[in-house]
Amino acid sequence: MGFVKVVKNKAYFKRYQVKFRRRREGKTDYYARKRLVIQDKNKYNTPKYRMIVRVTNRDIICQIAYARIEGDMIVCAAYAHELPKYGVKVGLTNYAAAYCTGLLLARRLLNRFGMDKIYEGQVEVTGDEYNVESIDGQPGAFTCYLDAGLARTTTGNKVFGALKGAVDGGLSIPHSTKRFPGYDSESKEFSAEVHRKHIMGQNVADYMRYLIEEDEDAYKKQFSQYIKNNVTPDMMEEMYKKAHAAIRENPVYEKKPKKEVKKKRWNRPKMSLAQKKDRVAQKKASFLRAQERAAES
């Protein structure tokens, strides 16, 4: 069929239907959302859980949510800006931080449901494929599905780092190794060692060593926060190992105490009747004194 010019007449505007608001804003892929949200009809009121991962300029957000008519309900959430509490003070948006955030989310969720002792996940980080299976006589493994949003799901994306962290933390999420760093599309082989290096931040450490040798100024500029916090390339692996152990030890979110705000009043408060009468009496007395002084002089 050839090119057909759209005639924008009265009928066109009368029948025009706008897309959903979040589609117009470019925030939601409804084609993907429909498939992530719709539950099997024979499961009735059982929620279909999604693991939502969003990467911003300075943070990584991981949430477990399910859909309702009123809107999505968040069951549990973890953020990369919580990682300094566990010893990771720098590089809060890299692949290793994404893994830590996913691990924190999984441990926090299982702790909330009292399943953290049943499903320990993969304690030793190998980078290899691992799947959580339900244990007989115990509650089934918590199953959810990855919601990557509008992120381009290329091999090595940080979204899959968070996924791997959640799976190693004890959540059952369907996945394959094809999108993890270390997968070679030509040979169709997956290198767990390469993936482990990314989880432990060794790719960043190698680049730091390269910059120290090649361009000292570029190193000082790009890794200023690492220098400020005394983080060297040789410390990286140990830092992440300690962080993983600390997350498993205490994944619970601690609420910050509310600050008591003293309200400032910018206008004068209204006077009571007694104050008003007193003010009038003072003005009268002042006026009479002034009159007396004038008469004496």
UniProtKB/Swiss-Prot annotation:
GO biological process, one term: ribosomal large subunit assembly
InterPro entries: Rbsml_uL18_euk, Ribosomal_uL18_C_euk
Compositional bias per record (Basic residues), positions renumbered to this chain: 258-268
Region (Disordered): 252-297
Molecular function GO labels: 5S rRNA binding; structural constituent of ribosome
Cross-link (Glycyl lysine isopeptide (Lys-Gly) (interchain with G-Cter in SUMO1)), chain numbering: 220
Keyword presence, Membrane: no
Compartments (UniProt record): Cytoplasm; Nucleus, Nucleolus
Keyword Transferase: no
Chief location category: cytoplasm
N-acetylglycine: residues carrying this PTM: 2
Family matches, as Gene3D superfamilies: 3.30.420.100
Cross-link (Glycyl lysine isopeptide (Lys-Gly) (interchain with G-Cter in SUMO2)): 220
Modification type Phosphothreonine: residues: 232
Source domain of life: Eukaryota
Residues found modified as Phosphoserine: 185, 272
Cellular component annotations (GO), alphabetically ordered: cytoplasm; cytosolic large ribosomal subunit; nucleolus
Residues modified as N6-acetyllysine: 5, 48, 220
Role according to the record: Component of the ribosome, a large ribonucleoprotein complex responsible for the synthesis of proteins in the cell. The small ribosomal subunit (SSU) binds messenger RNAs (mRNAs) and translates the encoded message by selecting cognate aminoacyl-transfer RNA (tRNA) molecules. The large subunit (LSU) contains the ribosomal catalytic site termed the peptidyl transferase center (PTC), which catalyzes the formation of peptide bonds, thereby polymerizing the amino acids delivered by tRNAs into a polypeptide chain.
Assembly information from the UniProt record: Component of the large ribosomal subunit (LSU). Part of the 5S RNP complex, which is a LSU subcomplex composed of the 5S RNA, RPL5 and RPL11. Component of a hexameric 5S RNP precursor complex, composed of 5S RNA, RRS1, RPF2/BXDC1, RPL5, RPL11 and HEATR3; this complex acts as a precursor for ribosome assembly. Interacts with NVL in an ATP-dependent manner. Interacts with RRP1B. Interacts with IPO5, IPO7 and KPNB1; these interactions may be involved in RPL5 nuclear import for the assembly of ribosomal subunits.
Family under the similarity heading: Belongs to the universal ribosomal protein uL18 family.
Protein name: Large ribosomal subunit protein uL18
Upper taxonomic lineage: Eukaryota, Metazoa, Chordata, Craniata, Vertebrata
